[in-house]
């Protein structure tokens, strides 16, 4: 079973659009243990060595929701840190240190919207792993 206390989202910048913030808050109510950090830059040195680092980037690998759930479950009891850059993306030195480059879609999304989509996919993955009716494939 996938647990939110093993997951964190680290993002550059703050959400400015109210409708995106409201959407994120709706999912946060469902997943209160999910950690979301907003900062001006990434400090990858603060991420523990045995944690999994997944960078969201347009050149990353794409998964459907079932595949993403399986991937996250395969990381067993490790903590998983998702990194979302700003409009300029994630610096290449940080991408080089990641365990996985993940693309949410072949389409390009504003970084604020990417956060909302990622949070929904995390909620969906948790629902899939719990056999909840939220995901109807």
Swiss-Prot record:
- CDD domains referenced in this protein's UniProt entry, alphabetically: RlmH-like
InterPro entries recorded for this chain? Alpha/beta_knot_MTases, RlmH-like, tRNA_m1G_MTases_N
Any one annotated GO CC term: cytoplasm
Residue positions binding S-adenosyl-L-methionine: 56, 85, 104-109
Gene of this entry: rlmH
Which Enzyme Commission number(s) are listed?
Answer: 2.1.1.177
Function of the protein: Specifically methylates the pseudouridine at position 1915 (m3Psi1915) in 23S rRNA.
Protein name, entry field = Ribosomal RNA large subunit methyltransferase H
Whom does it interact with, and what assembly results?
Homodimer.
Does the keyword rRNA processing belong to this entry? yes
**Reaction(s) catalyzed by this protein?**
pseudouridine(1915) in 23S rRNA + S-adenosyl-L-methionine = N(3)-methylpseudouridine(1915) in 23S rRNA + S-adenosyl-L-homocysteine + H(+)
User: Would you identify the family this protein belongs to, as annotated?
Assistant: Belongs to the RNA methyltransferase RlmH family.
Q: Which Pfam families match?
A: SPOUT_MTase
What keywords were assigned to this record?
A: Cytoplasm, Methyltransferase, rRNA processing, S-adenosyl-L-methionine, Transferase
Q: Where in the cell is it found?
A: Cytoplasm
Q: Which GO terms describe its molecular function?
A: rRNA (pseudouridine-N3-)-methyltransferase activity
> Where does this protein chiefly localize?
cytoplasm
């Amino acid at each position: 079973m996938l647990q939110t206390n093993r997951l964190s989202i680290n993002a550059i910048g703050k959400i400015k659009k109210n409708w995106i913030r409201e959407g994120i808050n709706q999912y946060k109510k469902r997943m209160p243990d999910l950690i979301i950090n907003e900062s001006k830059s990434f400090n990858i040195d603060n991420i523990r060595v045995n944690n999994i680092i997944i960078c969201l980037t347009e050149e990353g690998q794409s998964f459907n929701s079932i595949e993403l759930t399986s991937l996250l479950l395969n990381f067993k009891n490790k903590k998983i840190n998702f990194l979302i850059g700003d409009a300029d993306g994630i610096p290449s030195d940080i991408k080089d240190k990641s365990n996985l480059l993940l693309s949410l879609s072949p389409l390009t999304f504003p970084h604020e919207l990417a956060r909302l989509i990622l949070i929904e996919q995390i909620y969906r993955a948790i629902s899939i792993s719990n056999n909840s009716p939220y995901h109807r494939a």
